[in-house]
UniProtKB/Swiss-Prot annotation:
Organism phylogeny: Eukaryota, Amoebozoa, Evosea, Eumycetozoa, Dictyostelia
Species name: Dictyostelium discoideum (Social amoeba)
InterPro entries: Sdc1/DPY30
PANTHER family: DPY30 DOMAIN CONTAINING 2 (PTHR23356:SF16), DPY30-RELATED (PTHR23356)
Bias (Low complexity): 48-70, 119-163, 256-275, 322-340, 352-373, 998-1022, 1037-1125
Lineage: superkingdom: Eukaryota
Assigned GO CC terms: Set1C/COMPASS complex
Region Disordered, annotated ranges: 1-70, 119-169, 211-231, 248-374, 655-681, 935-957, 973-1125
Protein name: Putative uncharacterized protein DDB_G0271606
Residue pairs linked by disulfide bridges in the UniProt entry: none
Start-end of Polar residues biased regions: 1-31, 276-285, 292-317, 341-351
Amino acid sequence: MASIQTKLVSQPQTQQPLQNGFFNNYQQNIYRPQGIQSPPQQTPPSQPQQQPILPQQPQPQSQQPLHLQQQQQQQQQQQLLQQQQILQQQQQLLQLQQQQQNLIKQQQHQAQQQNFLHPQAQQVQSQLQLQSQPQPQPQPVNNVNNNNNNNNNNNNNNNNNNNKPFGTNNIHYSLVQQQQLLQQQAQQQLLQQQQHQQLLLQQQQAQQQSSLNNSLNSSGNNSTLNTSNNNNNVLLGANFNNASNPSINIGDPQLNNSNTNNVNNINTNNTNNNNKSGSIDQFGSPQIGVSYVNSSSNSAIPTPPTNQTNGSNSHSPTPVGINSNININSNLQSPQNIQQTILSPNISPNHNNNNNNNNNNNNNNNNNNNNNNKVSEELNEQLRMQQQQRQQQQQQIPQQPMQLLLQQQQQQQAQLQQQQAQLQQQQQAQLQQQQQAQLQQQQQAQQQAQQQAQQQQQQLKIYQQHFGQLQHQIHMLQQQPQNPQTQQQINGLLQQQAQIQQQQAIIIQQMQQMQQNQQIQQNQQLPQQQQQQQQQQQQQQQQAQQLLLQQQLQQQQQQQQQQQLQQAQQAQQQQQQQQQQQAQQQQQQQAQQQQQQQQQQQQQQQQQQQQQQQQQQQQQQQQQQQQQQQQQQQAQQQPQAQQSQQQAQQQQQNQQQPQQLNQNPPNQQLPQQPNQITQQQQQQQHQTNQILQNQQSQQILQLQQLQQQQQQQQQQQQQQQQQQQQQQQQLQQQQQQQQQQQQQQQQQQRQQPNQVQPNQPIDYNKKLELLNHPIWGKVLKETRQQIVLVYELLRMRCEGPHIKRNLFYQGIGLAPFSLSLPILSPSGLINATTGKPILKCTGSATSLYIVEDNNLFFQHNCGEQLVISKLFGAKVVPISTYESFLDHIVNILFNLTLLSPDELNLCTNRKNQPTFPLYQLDNKLSLVNQVQNQNQNQNNNNNNNNNNNNNINCNNANGTNIVISEVKNDINQLQPQQPPPQQQQAIPFVPSPTNDGNSVNNNINNNFINNNSFVNNNNNNNIQPTKSIIGVSNPFQNNNNNNNNNNNNNNNNNNNNNNNNNNNNNNNNNNNNNNNNNTNNNINNNINNQQQLYIQQQQYSQQQQQQQQNPQQQNPQQQNPQQLQQQQHLQQLQQQLLQQQLLQQQQQQQQQQQQQQQMQQQIQQPPQQNIEPINQLSDNQINMQQFNMLNNTNGNFNINNTNNLVRSSVQY
């Protein structure tokens, strides 16, 4: 990084804006951005560097002590060090940003290289693009050396005289403006890099058909733009950028690596008659001491010798324009000379130095020319090698399988991600180090200020003591007789007091100035901190953008991979189709060939047969001729006597011929020898036919084999396709797993939990965390689950975030369905486990009181009383009272440390575990079967003409008032006339240790056959409580003596009806059991969701309490920016969670509405009832009737509320 140099000029001048927003004003703030190297800042011993320090009041140096002067010098040195450190930190940050940008470029470049196509497709695509784009014009090779010479001249000349001091007396520039300039420079660099990338992409495509000479010509040409403006009264040259030249042709990116200094070196020159020169670099900062070019003969300046370019003369004027040799020097002079060159227009720079520098430059240029020739040859060889390697790679790429390419891409992506993560870690570490260093510096400065203040206070104390001593001496002298000596002594003492007062005033002023300086530094640090926060936010935004870019690149790569796979599949399908077509063509060709062969064979056979026939005919003719000759010879030799015999034989033959004609067909007129020949021909034909048949069968077998092979190939191809699909699925699964892992990591990074709404369900994972919390200690998991269930049910029932005790005690029969009750007893009883009395529980709204250990009575607001038996579990929760139980859950939030040791022992003792099942809530689906049971029981009651009802429905109105609604059929007709019968003995209740609720229901039905805790009274419609143990019946007297006979007759009919109803009830029970199992699962899920929400709320409240207990004693502007970011992130997450929760609530409401509609539809279908006339019953008949009903039917005690929460299987 180049050091940033700044300079201010106080004289105001007019501003002339240029193209890029920079002002062509030499008296504005002169700065050098990062692209231009400036000489190192050195301060001469006579003129030390002055930093911006507030002006102090003039004081005599004789009055200031030495240690104060030393302290001030130390402070100044520390301030200088702090500013240097801040500059170094900014440079490091800029370096890191550049590294990130380079990484992004590498990723894009690699992604472009990886996204290859088939070679043929690449050729087609490149041809189309080349047709649409203008091709670069070829240029001579010799221009490369010229351009390189110019660039080398510029680089060499800019590095001359770096050891000379640069003016530093008037340098004062604020860090805020520097940072703004750096931001502008970074934006310009980003724009330039984007343009550079676009040009690279275009030229890579164009260079595939261009030759090596053209690539060499385009690599070095136009890399520097040398322009001139021949104006008479212009002080500075024009400003140019890379974007202003549309014909820049950079060439291969690998060539650019060798010519990195050639880019962005845009130099401008200005020749004037008034001997005033200057130049503006790329970013608008003027360069001082520019040498003059021999552009006109009127110039009074001696022209230096120019470089020989393309055979031009040494003393000829150089043409001004592109590819011209312009020698520019940055001769840094003393500060006075620099001010003169800027402020005074008539003073010219030193020309002798320029001439000397030009001579040195010419020597350097000659060396550079030789080096460039060697470089060009090496570049030629490198380009050839690179092209050969690329061709080989392109030939090898289609042969590589897709899986290897995918793996390589994934590995490269992983490496890039690792590099980015490392860079981010380095950035974070550097930022932390910088923050720590700043804090240490601040602390040191504060300590030093404190030490100085203490020293000053001590000096003040010393002066005060000395002043008091002097006053005492004066007082003693004044008491003595006055003499001139005493007056002189008094005057001397008074002068010393005056000096002491002056020194005290000086110290006080210094202390005030220190305080003011501290305040000013604090005020200066505030904008710096704000800027740091802004920078961090910008870095985070950049990181987020980078992540988005990476995701987009990954998506593009995935899409391209999918496209490539699809193309590969299409190619395979085309290959398959081609193979099939080829196979069909082969089959057709084979069939045609076979036909042709058969035809040829037939023709050959016919020809052979014809030849054989011709040969046979010739043989026959020859034989006949021989026979004739023999006959003639014999005829000559034999006498005439034999002629008569021959004649006789001939006559006999002539007689035999007609007989043969009659016996044989005309075809058999041939002699015996031809018949033998035909038989041989037939045998030959038969053999040939067999051979042909064998050949045909072999051909058929071959065809079948070919078909089988084709089928096998098709199967293999199908298997390959399946494997590819499986691989794609595996890749998708891996991607999903990676996404899930990232989501899990993000969730783990969230330190603070989100706020939880009060009535929302807790997540299952949060519930597990709650149950496994270390605050429970050794408490059993069963007790933990029961406590959590109670709290969830209370939250589900009650409205609002807080639970009211009044609502709880009014709805205690509804909310804690799965509650395991504590061991409760009156104050007179003693608990068997602890040996201590257990107090009676009383609530705020109503009273809870106990008859015995096993039974609990509580009173509703309707004036009626119900009983909760031991079925809910009396020995699970070892808390003394119901109210304390609620306090532990609601107010203390599961803080079990407040429990007594006895209660904790009960919680951790395995012997106290329940041996009975724990009940849970019923869902709405179970209500359907319960309504059917109610309708059947009503049929039984109507048929029996009784006023007793087994099904007592307790409904909750508006969530607060509970009313027991009984189905009362003509209660007033029953009149008490006889005393009540004797009470029957109670059968003890022994619950089964199973976890199945059905077995408990059966036990209850069997055990409570003779129990009847509720009997209707004709005079009082309210149900009265019993004062005995449940399990002992206590019926009241009913005076119904007139209807005994009628009731006996009706009982016989009712028994028959009950038997039928029992069968129906058994079926209904089975349905209920299935529904209960389903609903229990749903309830458990809801409870788990609620518990997680509660835990999140608890953790959030604890963190808020900790923050309140340990507040940060810092200014709001000095807070850690990470905390602010975390808070913002948490707020966003909270909003997302709220939206999700609202959606879940809407879905649940919709489901509930659908279930309610189903229930109403089923309830609206009333069963057919057989109504019979009402008859009066006697007391004995009533008791017997109750006994039969309890024995044969299910006495369900159903308690309902507005939330459809039903307590199941509470039997009496």
